[in-house]
């Protein structure tokens, strides 16, 4: 299969620039992958698609305000850093602008001097390893000085940065939000739990590679970025019990899917507590191990995420669903509407 097989025309005005006032007021396209039937609903009605004994699996990662603006200590010239991942201790891999002026040994100061960094290594493509120096707790300093790194297709400024976090976000480490979870409110989750559905949390820290376009024609040549994931023993035990009792594992978003399927692939279809790095690429032809249904937002043309959804529901049905959504003026991407596929 080729990348072009997953292309579609998306009018730019359908790219949501801001979140809706109410999280669960977004639209929900329900797709039956067996019959091809589609229903236009609102997100709150996802509760009608869940049965007692099912497990709803969510990614509890929290987005870091990972964009930092500072000055070179020597010259006072402006520097922008985007934190990518914590490599060890206080060292981080970052994207730097302007990178060519940041040599090993360059010192950078941020804000009122509560945070500083020194470049320890030069990488390719504007990448650097920097070591941060600070007082108190790093994440607290970052929360006060950093800005949220919104996706490249969002041009509006975000008034409330919590709207780019899920209501259950707690494990800091992502460069982007697991956006399928943005639709849930605490009230809706309480209703779902009261129905007898198990709420299960895992962690996958979303990397910036999630926005990287596929640059090859042949899908077999595409290399996925790696992301850190973690599933606790308690969560794994709940999911095993759900499966044993005939319930479904319903994933919220592609990050939850990739974590569950990574673990299922690693342990011959069994669900076990695990942590590590995954670069799983789920595309048509993939044999599913764990996930029975899922919700997800609407993704970019030719993206690996459209390919993942197509692996579950079939390429033609997914493209039909996308064309339907465009005709019905669904909102796309991170702050957009959602679909539920079962």
Swiss-Prot record:
Monomer. This is S-adenosylmethionine:tRNA ribosyltransferase-isomerase. Belongs to the QueA family. InterPro entries: QueA (IPR003699), QueA_dom1 (IPR042118), QueA_dom2 (IPR042119), QueA_sf (IPR036100). Its main location: cytoplasm. It catalyses: 7-aminomethyl-7-carbaguanosine(34) in tRNA + S-adenosyl-L-methionine = epoxyqueuosine(34) in tRNA + adenine + L-methionine + 2 H(+). It comes from the Bacteria. It is an enzyme of class 2 (transferase). GO terms for biological process: queuosine biosynthetic process; tRNA wobble guanine modification. Pathway: tRNA modification; tRNA-queuosine biosynthesis.
